[in-house]
């Protein structure tokens, strides 16, 4: 028995060593405080960051199956593995992004102009304004949170001609905001992060921070950067609630 056991142990050890390493689940991607794009892996509340090798990002978004990154010279399109699959020349400055229901790139906004992805090209939409957040609203329309003076309005417009289809004042919304794929508006109210759906129903989670910006981190996730270059948070949006987690960052 001893001889058989001794002979068996090295075989077991070899079998264990031969097993492939288990990779943590992918959550999405964020840009860190230095502008480098980091893949976010792990589980809620226990995130690990991995450098994608992409730097100088001024805006970034990820849907779970595709990514969009704006640098001061280009707009980059990424696949699910964070590999660049297309690039477009672009002026300096930040951008807003939106994806379709399948997670494919749909819209981009920068320098006062709205663009749509169509047939592998980036085409301008006949609309201009001070957009705060954008989303696709059906196959032929876009939803935009527009700043008008000290008010924010939610506008739905035609992608074909740029005509406004309907609009409404976003009562109680004044700061940075985001739009989810279902049209819900995300904003800060006092100490809470709020998700308000089309019926006016709200989900809240305590945050206690001033927000610089929201960006899409992954499917069902938003990145939230605290004002003044502060901490980075991940907001998980569930049908019945919200969860907020701090994301560890690599020291610059």
Predicted regions: what they are:
Residues 6-15:
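Bacterial N-terminal signal peptides
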Residues 225-252:
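Blade-level signature of beta-propeller repeat domains, shared across WD40, Kelch, NHL, RCC1
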């Amino acid at each position: 028995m001893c001889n058989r056991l001794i002979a068996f142990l090295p075989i077991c050890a070899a079998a264990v060593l031969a097993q492939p390493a288990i990779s943590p689940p992918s959550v999405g991607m964020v840009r860190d405080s230095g502008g480098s794009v980091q893949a976010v892996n792990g589980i809620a509340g226990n995130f690990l960051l991995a450098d994608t090798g992409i730097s100088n990002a001024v805006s970034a978004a990820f849907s779970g199956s595709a990514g969009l990154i704006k640098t001061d010279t280009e707009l980059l399109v990424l696949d699910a593995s964070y590999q660049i699959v297309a690039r477009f020349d672009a002026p300096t400055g930040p951008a807003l992004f939106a994806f379709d229901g399948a997670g494919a790139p749909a819209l981009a906004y920068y320098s006062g102009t709205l663009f749509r992805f169509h047939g592998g090209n980036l085409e301008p939409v006949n609309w201009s304004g001070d957009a705060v957040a954008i989303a696709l609203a059906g196959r032929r329309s876009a939803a935009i949170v527009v700043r008008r003076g000290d008010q924010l309005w939610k506008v739905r417009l035609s992608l074909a001609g740029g005509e406004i289809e309907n609009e409404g004042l976003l009562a109680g919304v004044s700061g940075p905001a985001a739009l989810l794929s279902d049209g819900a508006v995300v904003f800060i109210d006092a100490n809470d992060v709020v998700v308000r759906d089309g019926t006016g129903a709200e989900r809240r989670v305590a945050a206690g921070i001033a927000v610089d910006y929201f960006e899409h981190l992954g499917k069902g996730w938003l990145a939230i950067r605290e004002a003044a270059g502060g901490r980075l948070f991940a907001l998980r949006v569930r049908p019945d609630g919200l969860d907020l987690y701090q994301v560890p960052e690599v020291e610059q």
